[in-house]
Swiss-Prot record:
Organism: Flavobacterium johnsoniae (strain ATCC 17061 / DSM 2064 / JCM 8514 / BCRC 14874 / CCUG 350202 / NBRC 14942 / NCIMB 11054 / UW101)
Source organism phylogeny: Bacteria, Pseudomonadati, Bacteroidota, Flavobacteriia, Flavobacteriales
Protein name, UniProt field: Aspartate--tRNA ligase
Domain of life: Bacteria
HAMAP family: Asp_tRNA_synth_type1
Keyword Nucleotide-binding set for record: yes
Length: 583
């Protein structure tokens, strides 16, 4: 037996107990006649003491050779600690060591294994197995495990069945590029790694597995951002014989359950807003509603004056920033420079100070009087002491720019408290979106999403106005889940493929198996998928998902620890019938 207890469980009630511990040397303090060693494992730290007057000489001398991160086993007696440490659970005791075994030595780590380390991100990713020993990373992985267990418990209690679906599937157009896997036994043919288990979970519904879930790896070969990984994990769910309301209720319940069990928070409100309302009011379809600053459209009050910039704009829109009326000109100019950055792309910005006496001071006083600006204040719900910032230009582009400014200001003003949680549903998404370059419509979610029955007639005349039975769950400005009611009959699915530009032959080649299944009695069904990585990061109060993934990739999609991806040798390429052009 390597250990009778772990390094986080012993306390004063264990005094005089003989114990065996094993772990890593965190640090040691050699005072000549006395040597203290902090022994660490996943559960905590226990102090060991080697006393020249009470410890066997051989053991005492061996303890002096211990280095950082040596793996050791000790046997000894729990005794009361003279200098108690109230900051750790084991701070009342220490172990008077009688036996010491060095299980493995260790090189000096390239960074300190401490909560606050001196290692940069690159070196910590290269030695990720060492980084996992640090409390912040270890605790993030344990936190992820707890969330996953609560998900399984909640769904299992509702009679959901966890079913695994294949990882080697057929490449189909789902939006992002597929990762492809060559088949040695089928020359010139390839599998793809799934971007989601979408078609398989629909086939499970046809198969009668009416409540399915899976915590599953998915893969997308796309350009990476700080919050994206080429492989990611979904809480994937599907239900048969349900309407949209049934699905929203189940997964609203899951979210409430997680917030209560993980964070101890009861959620009172769970608003539902339409996609159109979200875009008009917040400028994006995943609004952060922990704070206000709703958009106020100002065309009616700002145009038809003498200010040519607003007169030429498709949209004039502003937000009221609480308490920002005392911003200096330097601070305002800094914000103007911020919105002019290429990442935002605004050409300029107008500001209005809402004075405490009910008057207004703006950068366009030459064109607008106090009564005009009072109307702007009313439209943006501005109060005395606030500042109104106004952008103008093409409607969609301007809303996106103001949305970016809204989020930046909320961050600067401390309005995005990571311990406050404000979930909501966004519903009634457009079924299709137009690609302006190709002139073709694309499915906003995926081609299996059903249109709202009352909008079916619009498919022939105004396809861009057709609404989908689709819904996203948003938490603190992040889309954490999305889903839809699916098409479950062949005729409607064929019609959808037609509007997406598929020929009959292409649709059959790509998705014939699904349409065939629909002919054998497919039930009405729908589902949803949560992004587990993003969900645990938000619940854990962190900005990046990497901290919650054991072995993440970097921003270039590389695993620098194992140096992947990597070339394969010519023999493997030949066996796979692959020839690589010169690079």
């Amino acid at each position: 037996m390597y250990r009778s207890h772990n390094c986080g469980e012993l306390n004063a009630s264990n005094i005089n107990t003989e114990v065996t511990l094993a772990g890593w040397v965190q640090k040691s303090r050699d005072k000549g006649f006395m040597n203290w060693v902090d022994l660490r494992d996943r559960y905590g730290i226990t102090q060991l003491i080697f006393d020249e007057s009470r410890t066997d000489k051989t053991v005492f001398e061996l303890a002096k050779t211990l280095g950082r991160e040596f793996v050791i086993q000790v046997k000894g007696t729990v005794i009361e600690r003279e200098a108690k440490n109230k900051n750790i659970p084991t701070g009342e005791i220490e172990i008077l060591v009688s036996e010491l075994t060095i299980l493995n030595t260790a090189l000096t780590p390239p960074f300190t294994i401490e909560d606050e380390t001196d290692g940069g991100e690159d070196i910590r990713m290269k030695y990720r197995y060492l980084d996992i020993r640090r409390n912040p990373v270890k605790n993030s992985l344990l936190f992820r495990h707890k969330v996953a267990m609560e998900v399984r418990k909640y769904l299992s209690d509702l009679d959901f069945c966890e079913v695994e679906t294949p990882y080697l599937i057929k490449s189909t157009p789902e939006g992002a590029r597929d990762f492809v896997v060559p088949s040695r036994m089928n020359e010139g043919q390839f599998y793809a790694l799934p971007q989601s288990p979408q078609t398989f979970k629909q086939l499970l519904m046809v198969g009668g597995m009416d409540k399915y879930f899976q915590i599953v790896k998915c893969f997308r070969d796309e350009d990476l951002r700080a919050d994206r990984q080429p492989e990611f994990t979904q809480i994937d769910c599907e239900m048969a014989f349900v309407e949209q309301e049934d699905i929203l209720n189940v997964f609203e319940g899951l979210t409430r359950h997680l917030l209560k069990e993980i964070k101890g928070i009861e959620v009172d409100k769970f608003p539902r807003i339409t996609y159109d309302y979200a875009m008009k009011t917040y400028g994006n379809d995943k609004p952060d509603i922990r704070f206000g600053m709703k958009f106020g459209e100002l065309n009616e009050f700002a145009q038809h004056k003498e200010f040519p910039v607003f007169n030429a704009a498709e949209l004039v829109v502003g937000i009221a920033v609480p308490g920002a009326g005392n911003y200096t000109r330097k601070e305002i100019d800094g914000l103007i420079d911020w919105v002019k950055r290429p990442q935002v792309g605004a050409s300029g910005m107008v500001y209005v100070k809402c004075n405490e006496d009910g008057t207004y001071k703006s950068s366009v006083d030459k064109f607008y009087d106090n009564d005009d600006l009072a109307k702007w204040a009313k439209a943006t719900e501005a109060n005395p002491g606030d500042m109104i910032f106004v952008l103008s230009g093409p409607a969609n582009k301007t809303r996106a720019q103001l949305s970016a400014l809204r989020m930046e200001l909320a961050t600067r003003l401390g309005l995005r408290n990571p311990e406050e949680f404000a979930p909501l549903w966004v519903v009634d998404f457009p079924l299709l979106e137009l690609d302006e370059e190709s002139g073709r419509y694309h499915a906003m979610h995926h081609p299996f999403t059903s249109p709202k029955p009352e909008d079916m007639a619009l498919l022939e005349t105004e396809p861009g106005k057709v609404r989908a039975n689709a819904y996203d769950m948003v938490l603190n400005g992040n889309e954490i889940g999305g889903g839809s009611i699916r098409i479950h009959d062949k005729a409607t699915q064929q019609l959808m493929f037609k509007y997406l530009g598929f020929t009959e032959e292409e649709a059959k080649a790509q998705f014939g198996f699904l349409m065939d299944a629909f002919q054998f009695g497919a039930p009405p069904h729908g589902g949803l998928a949560f992004g587990l990585d993003r969900l645990v990061a938000i619940l854990g109060g962190q900005e990046t998902i990497r901290d919650f993934i054991a072995f993440p990739k970097n921003n270039s999609g590389r695993d620098v620890m194992i140096d992947a991806p990597a070339a394969i040798d010519d023999a493997q390429l030949k066996e796979l019938h692959i020839k690589i052009d010169s690079i």
